[in-house]
Design a protein with these regions (language model features):
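Nucleotide-activated donor-binding/catalytic signature segment of Leloir-type glycosyltransferases, i.e.
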Residues: 1-19
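A short, well-ordered alpha-helix in the C-terminal region of glycosyltransferases
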Residues: 85, 92, 99-114, 120-126
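Short alpha-helical segment that forms part of, or immediately flanks, the ligand-binding pocket
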Residues: 26, 45-53, 67-68
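Short alpha-helical donor nucleotide-sugar binding micro-motif in glycosyltransferases
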Residues: 19-20, 27-32
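Conserved acidic donor-binding segment of nucleotide-sugar-dependent glycosyltransferases
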Residues: 72, 76-83, 92-97
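Short hydrophobic beta-strand element within catalytic cores of glycosyltransferases
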Residues: 57-60
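Aromatic "clamp/platform" in nucleotide-sugar-dependent glycosyltransferases that forms part
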Residues: 40
Length: 135
C-alpha cells in the first residue's frame, strides 16, 4: 500500500501507523476526520463498532452486517461495487463537517445502546430463561 501511495504521489497525505496498542488505537480513531470501511467482505466489523462508540463519522461499504450496525443519519453506507460513492461520501464528511459530527454523535448513541453490557446480560439471561422453560 505504501508503494501504491508513493506511486500516486500520495505518500505525504497517507500515514501508515503500523501496530498500535489499545490506547494508541483509541487516540488514532479520535484524531481522524472519518473512519472508512471499504471492505468487500465483512460480517459485523469490530472496527466499525469501535469508531461508532468513539463518535467518529463513518463511511462503510454495505456488506455483511454493516447496515445493521450503521443506520441512516448515523453515517454513510454505500454499495460496495460503487467506489465513486465512497469518494462522494468521504468528500461529504469534509464538506459538511457539522453534519458529519452530528452523525458521529448519533452513531455513538446507537453503539452505546448496542454494546451496553447490562442490557446485553439481561437480554441473554431472558433468552436462557425462555429456553429453560421450554425444556
Amino acid at each position: 500500500l505504501a508503494r501504491l501511495a508513493d506511486k500516486n504521489d500520495l505518500g505525504d497525505k497517507i500515514h501508515f501507523l503500523g501496530a498500535l496498542n489499545e490506547q494508541q488505537m483509541k487516540q488514532a480513531f479520535l484524531d481522524c476526520n472519518v473512519f472508512v470501511l471499504p471492505s468487500t467482505i465483512e460480517n459485523s466489523p469490530n472496527s466499525l463498532g469501535e469508531a461508532m462508540l468513539l463518535g467518529v463519522p463513518c463511511v462503510a461499504a454495505d456488506v455483511g452486517g454493516v447496515s445493521n450496525m450503521l443506520h441512516p443519519g448515523q453515517g454513510y453506507v454505500y454499495q460496495s461495487t460503487a467506489p465513486y460513492m465512497l469518494a462522494h461520501y468521504i468528500t461529504e464528511v469534509f464538506r459538511q463537517q457539522e453534519r458529519a459530527e452530528e452523525m458521529g454523535a448519533q452513531a455513538r448513541l446507537q453503539a452505546m445502546e448496542t454494546h451496553n453490557p447490562e442490557k446485553n446480560m439481561r437480554d441473554l439471561l431472558e433468552i436462557y430463561r425462555v429456553i429453560a422453560e421450554e425444556q
